Amino acid sequence: MLFRSAVAEMVGGNRLLRIDSHGILTHVAGDGVVGDAGDGGPALAARFNGPHNLAVLPDGDVLLGDTWNGRVRRYHAGPGTVSTLPGFNAPPPAARTNGPYCITLTPDGRELVIADLRRVQVLTLSTGRLRVVAGNGKKGTPADGAAAVDAPLADPRAAAYDRRGNLYILERNGHALRVVGPDGRIRTVVNAAGAKGATGDGGPALAATLNGPKHLGIDRDDSVLIADAENHLVRRYSPSTGLITRVAGTGKKGAAGVGGPPEQCELNRPHGVTVHRDGTLYITDSYNHRVLRIVP
């Protein structure tokens, strides 16, 4: 997934890469071998295990969700070293379920939102305090209006806060987008039925269907971009209207159409969507092994 000037090569690559403003790609962390080593030493000698997501700190350091090691690692850009972020640990084999599949910073940059496949937690970076904000650890469909911390979730794959204090949670096997309001109550906003499908673009989001969505991003207007992976689409949920629309992809798996309208560009199981502060949308077109950019 690409954010600002960093790219993480996910799962199979076990590396962290960086693209600078001139388009030059540099390998900055990870030796490409599966493992759990390297804290305190050179980042290029460090080993990761299936990293799925990253977040860039205000100081330029990069947090990496080292998913199957069950930890969050920190790449220190200045000295070029790696360390483990204190406060979160899911020891193997629990890391396959409870590892950090998605990490996002809160809008103020002070806390880290961590989604595993059972719950969503928030880590205060200054203190290392970790608290659960959604999910009771059981798999199921949450009831609208339930307290989020007491509700089950169906494989929450990604989570992020908007600027109004709403927490959006994307469920991979629930095929749905939920929101937890500032009052701590959860409700469904996309796919009320929870059915697997690819319907509803241009209409009410509650009547739409998704298929194995993998990631989300919050746009500058607080709309939610969804990497609808198994539909080979990127879609947008607009809270102000309650509608869902197609942003990119034809719905057909493929690689054609780069350089043309985003809706005519084929995708192949996109696993990441990130909005730069200038409004540029980056799409991790995972099974085409490429990163795409949509300029506003």
Regions found by a protein language model. Name each.
Residues H22-G50, P79-Y101, T127-D155, R185-G212, ...:
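Gly/Pro-rich loop segments of beta-rich domains
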